[in-house]
Amino acid sequence: MGERAGSPGTDQERKAGKHHYSYLSDFETPQSSGRSSLVSSSPASVRRKNPKRQTSDGQVHHQAPRKPSPKGLPNRKGVRVGFRSQSLNREPLRKDTDLVTKRILSARLLKINELQNEVSELQVKLAELLKENKSLKRLQYRQEKALNKFEDAENEISQLIFRHNNEITALKERLRKSQEKERATEKRVKDTESELFRTKFSLQKLKEISEARHLPERDDLAKKLVSAELKLDDTERRIKELSKNLELSTNSFQRQLLAERKRAYEAHDENKVLQKEVQRLYHKLKEKERELDIKNIYSNRLPKSSPNKEKELALRKNAACQSDFADLCTKGVQTMEDFKPEEYPLTPETIMCYENKWEEPGHLTLDLQSQKQDRHGEAGILNPIMEREEKFVTDEELHVVKQEVEKLEDEWEREELDKKQKEKASLLEREEKPEWETGRYQLGMYPIQNMDKLQGEEEERLKREMLLAKLNEIDRELQDSRNLKYPVLPLLPDFESKLHSPERSPKTYRFSESSERLFNGHHLQDISFSTPKGEGQNSGNVRSPASPNEFAFGSYVPSFAKTSERSNPFSQKSSFLDFQRNSMEKLSKDGVDLITRKEKKANLMEQLFGASGSSTISSKSSDPNSVASSKGDIDPLNFLPGNKGSRDQEHDEDEGFFLSEGRSFNPNRHRLKHADDKPAVKAADSVEDEIEEVALR
């Protein structure tokens, strides 16, 4: 369309150019006629060539005055004005105008008019073409819009195809599922139809059988039905009779149960009263035993009245021996139940383990006269020790008898409980048999369950009471052990005359382990009691740890919280006491004068403990005022000697010190001091273990 619009425009421009050139040539050369003829001939030729155009131009010329264009009007006026001006200017010059000029002028005017008409026509055409161009542009814009829409639709075709494919797949799946459902329903319909056919067939058979009344099976069935009804009536009668009997028996059984419960409560109350009486008697016996133990343990202590250093040292050793025996008596009573002789046997190797040490030639040259004196002096010590041992044996016998009585009481209680349980079980079995037969087991279970609940409550209450009683006994034993650990030392008898009697027999001797302990208290442990705390700790650190055999015969018998497989305490105690007697006999034969001499004592300490033991003895002998400095940590039986005048004063002061029991006196402080050296040997630990065992049970 653009090319078509462009081609007529170019033709019109060419025509306008041709007319313009001819018009200018006419105005430029008005005088030349030749040119005018040429100009006149040119439009004529144009008219000849384009006759159609002339007709159209004529039409336009005729139409032009009707609708003159705005552009054409000023051109016409201008041409006319210019023509008039030229004519006015030329009129005086050319007065003699010819006809040729008039013709030329008229031809020019005609030409101008024609050109003006053509211009107006062209302007009209141009306006029409502009309108046409605008309309074509609008059409092009619309067509472009339509094309864009079409292109967009073409682009969307792929998406539409994809969506369409998805819809097709979904529809196919739905179709498949619906087909499967249809098949399943068809199968069900077939099954139901087959079942219906079978049921119809069976129904027809049953109808035929029911219509046939003259069958032999029907008579048999009627007879069986009558017999079953008769049996049912008989069973109902029996059930009624049994239910009545059951009610009567349950009533009688409840009465018996109430009577037995009353008896059980009465027996339980009596048992409580008897248990209280037994406990009261047991506490009384314990208190009496404690009083006897306290009197027997501290009735035969030695007083410290010694005029010489040697006698004072011998008295110290004997007092240490007595304190060891007192500890053994008190602590042996506490832990007799848990003691096992298999763990710590008394072998002759332990007794004679230190004999080879005393066979050296330096210790064999002893003073025989001092041996005689010491032997006769220590003979008097054995009498109170023997009495104490006999009392200890009697106390142990009483303790064992009490244990046997308690065991018998426990066995009786258990037997009574077992009998009651057996009786209840037998009664329950008797009741359950008719209940299971009649099918009314639940009616009789209610009182039985109540009885079981009461029985369980009674058992729980008995267990609680037993546990509380056991805990109370353990607390009392703890209090007793504490009271026995810290007793008050009474005055000891005067053994000076016995120790230093003139009748002494000369005899060589050997030290054993037990005699060494009885002299010095566990390898001379009590030597540290006359020194301050630091020196005692140093000597304790130098000493090697005690072997298990030492626990069998010393100041303490340990308990290891094992009550099973106990041996006979009487045979064990008798063997132990025989050993102590033998050791004391050896002690009476030994010479006390060896230990009283400072040089020989220092040698013995060096052999046993090295240089630390001798340094402690030298510090004791050099420091006479150490008793006053370390009064709280010193054994009251061991004091340092001075000159004779001061010794008598110290003896009087010590007698007053023994009499004042509550004045900064603690006889068991040295035991607590050395408790860290032997942590396994503690009675309190065993009692705590027993408390934990009872709580766990």
Curated annotation (Swiss-Prot):
Low complexity composition-biased segments: 32-45, 612-626
Coiled-coil residue windows: 103-297, 389-485
Cellular-component GO terms for this entry: axoneme; centrosome; ciliary basal body; cilium; mitochondrion; nucleolus; nucleoplasm; photoreceptor connecting cilium
Localisation per UniProt entry: Cytoplasm, Cytoskeleton; Cytoplasm, Cytoskeleton, Cilium axoneme; Cytoplasm, Cytoskeleton, Cilium basal body; Cytoplasm, Cytoskeleton, Microtubule organizing center, Centrosome
Chief location bin: cytoplasm
Tissue: Widely expressed.
Biased composition (Basic and acidic residues): 416-432
List of residues that carry Phosphoserine: 7, 45
Molecular function as annotated in GO: protein-containing complex binding
Pfam families associated with the record: Lebercilin
Disordered, as annotated region: 1-90, 412-432, 522-548, 606-697
Entry-linked InterPro entries: Lebercilin-like, Lebercilin_dom
Stretches with biased composition (Acidic residues): 686-697
UniProt-listed GO biological process terms: intraciliary transport; photoreceptor cell maintenance; protein transport
Compositionally biased spans, kind Polar residues: 527-547
Record bears the keyword Transport: yes
Assigned keywords, A-Z: Cell projection, Cilium, Coiled coil, Cytoplasm, Cytoskeleton, Disease variant, Leber congenital amaurosis, Phosphoprotein, Protein transport, Transport
Family annotation (PANTHER family): C21ORF13-RELATED, LEBERCILIN
Assembly mode: Interacts with NINL. Interacts with OFD1. Interacts with FAM161A. Interacts with components of the IFT complex B.
Known disease link: Leber congenital amaurosis 5: A severe dystrophy of the retina, typically becoming evident in the first years of life. Visual function is usually poor and often accompanied by nystagmus, sluggish or near-absent pupillary responses, photophobia, high hyperopia and keratoconus.
Protein family membership: Belongs to the LCA5 family.
Functional description taken from the UniProt entry: Involved in intraflagellar protein (IFT) transport in photoreceptor cilia.
Name under which the protein is recorded: Lebercilin
Native species: Homo sapiens
